[in-house]
Amino acid sequence: MSRTDQLALAVSLLAVFAAALVAGNIFENVPHLEDEIAYVWQARLLVEGKLTIPSPQHEKSFLVPFVVDHNGERFGKYPPGWPLVLSLGVALGTRGLVNPILAGVGVWLTYLLGKRVFGPLVGLLAAALTLSSPFFLINSGSLLSHPLGLVLSAGFALLWLAAFGDRNAPRRWSYSLGAAVLMGLLILARPFTALGVALPFGLHGLYLLFYGGCTPEQRRQTRLHLLGFGALGLAFAGLHFLWQYRVTGDPFLNPYTLWWEYDKIGFGPGVGVTEDGHSLHIARINTRFSLRAAWRDLFGWSSYSWLFLPFGLLACLRKPKGLLLGVVFPSLVLIHIFYWIGSELFGPRYYYEGLYSLTLFSALGAAWLAGWRVEPDPEPQDYPGAVRQSSGGVGLLDRLRLRLAPAYSWFAERAASAVHQPALFKVRQYLVPMALVLLVAYNLVYFLPGRLWEMHGLYTISRSDLYPFLAPEAQELTPALIIVHSERWMSYGSLLELQDPRLTTPFIFAWSRGPIADEAVAADFPERNLFHYYVEEPGRFYLAPRDP
């Protein structure tokens, strides 16, 4: 392991520690969003090896956000990929460490991607920038599925480049099928995100079908591996539809629409919350807000987190593999135009799985400006196609590059001369690193603490909501049915942390829906002590509804 590898590993371990701090001190290791509550509910059920359970008799009183009741069965609306991973933490009693560990893996994979395509220094800088990112830390401390998505996306990209990054290199099934497995797992975790991640690589694969080698044998091997990749990917996609069939009885019924009928992909009436449905105008507004959040939360440099991206693009013009990594984020932005809602609270989290596009290109741009080495370690070129390529075996992209070479050379020479003048050589060597240090320091000292604290007590949910039920005197009241009197779901939803899906825990909670409904619920649990709980009076349990 090289010195740079050791530093990258240290940064990755630091990411685990930092994310765990955010999970414990900001989010208090409890779910806040409806999504998180549903994920935890699904994970607890998966520990039992179940996808569904029979719906409770009074399903509206025992509402769980984003958990659906359909045809007498109760199940989460989310695909099983992330709940299955989270269930490992639930089973081991380490639920709060699952995403921090995934965060560390995501940082390490970002380093490996940068090292492979741009060199170890760029990879290390990208890993460090990722660690400093408020966007990264907020999502890594949550119970959302995005950290898993980032690991699967980055791991897939790394294996794809190993399998198909050099169109003339020998193909290895371990790489091509490994890439298919990771893409398949992403489909089972976040299917729409998987589409956005796969889009640029799919276009690359189409190119390789026709120009994937200099010899007939190389092209045959490339096509065989691409077909194997596609077949395995389709098998995982089939598992997604099998899951939909298992929980809904219809392989093409999206459980999202069982909670909100309008929660669909596309445009027009019936899609989204507006009367006329989702439209390009709404998509433009959503995208603008999401990107504004991205430039704020990416590195915490006010609204200038994009500062080094143009220079990264300029430095990458001669690196097709780098461009392939760089378009993952824009691809996610593009496909989410078809979704009716944007994302800002946790940053633009629907684009999170393309985070490495931004961190790698920012690191590349900074390194290029500073005059650092931005070339990967040379790969061995002793396979047969390497010689033939130089003797005329070129494909479409190679021919296009040759045709554009004069124009590119003119542009590149002038850009380089503007930035890399000898008089500025020493200046930029020191100026760019100093600017980076100042920008990161600004984020760590001024922006990041406040941005993280904004998320503390999100939706008025806090671990302190659970304390009245954890007190020894409260435990003596169990087994108990608690009728929660609250106008908003948050005060009721925060207590679901103490309840299992089968309603067998010492405390179970029902959301009050009026005297008649509450009495009917109580009649179903004669073996439990009945109490009424008013969230504005924490720690006080009423034997009967209090007077208005």
Predicted regions and their residues:
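Perimembrane helix-loop-helix junctions
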Residues: L159-R167, R172, G196-A237, F241-L242, ...
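Short helix- or helix-capping micro-motifs
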Residues: G123-L131, A154, L158, A179, ...
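Transmembrane-helix motifs of polytopic, lipid-linked glycan transferases
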Residues: R95-L121, G155-L159, F311
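Membrane-interface transmembrane helices that cradle and orient dolichyl/undecaprenyl
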Residues: V85, K115-F118, F156-S176, L186, ...
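Hydrophobic/aromatic-rich transmembrane helices and adjacent perimembrane loops
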Residues: Y39-V40, N139-S140, H146, A189, ...
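Transmembrane-helix signature of polytopic, membrane-embedded enzymes
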Residues: A8-S12, L92, W108-S133, L150-V151, ...
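Signature aromatic-anchored transmembrane alpha helix within multi-pass, membrane-resident enzymes
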Residues: L7-L13, G202, G230-L234, L360, ...
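Hydrophobic, aromatic-rich transmembrane alpha-helices
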Residues: V105-V107, H204, Y211, R288-G326, ...
